[in-house]
Amino acid sequence: HDCREGICGMCSLYINGHPHGPATGATTCQIYMRRFNDGDTITVEPWRSAGFPVIKDLMVDRTAYDKIMQAGGYVSVRTGAPQDANAILIPKPIADEAMDAASCIGCGACVAACKNGSAMLFVSAKVSQLNLLPQGKPEALRRAKAMLSKMDELGFGNCTNTRACEAECPKNVSIS
């Protein structure tokens, strides 16, 4: 099951050799058959990565992302009541950058596209999303170290800056 809106990442598949298929900026659930010509051969495969082992057929285990998030993808410092957190002023450029990082849906296309199976784009997006905001600053260093350590522990590869992750990301998350 998936959201059919490109916001949950559960539909993650390789279609004709590309994570999420041939369209740019779209997830698998947003790819329609009308994109293909009559008689085309369509190859559908599960993600290919040691970090996402195949469970059965096209289903992969993506709980590694959950484990990375559990290692530090949250803010635990007290910011007051919910309305108090909303009163913290954040400059627009920083808020925009944090929102861009928050657009990562954790689908795994970056890992599937990377020849090393690196989850660095996912981890950096989640770390940036939280570390840019005032509420996340007190735990910024600990968060980054914990999430990177968990990524390494789970067997994801290292980044070699080929930018394949960025090219295949359906939400256009940038490595910079």
Language-model segments: which ranges?
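A generic, well-ordered mixed alpha/beta core segment in the N-terminal half of proteins
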Residues: C8-A64
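Active-site nucleophile and cofactor-binding loops and adjacent substrate-binding regions
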Residues: H1-G6
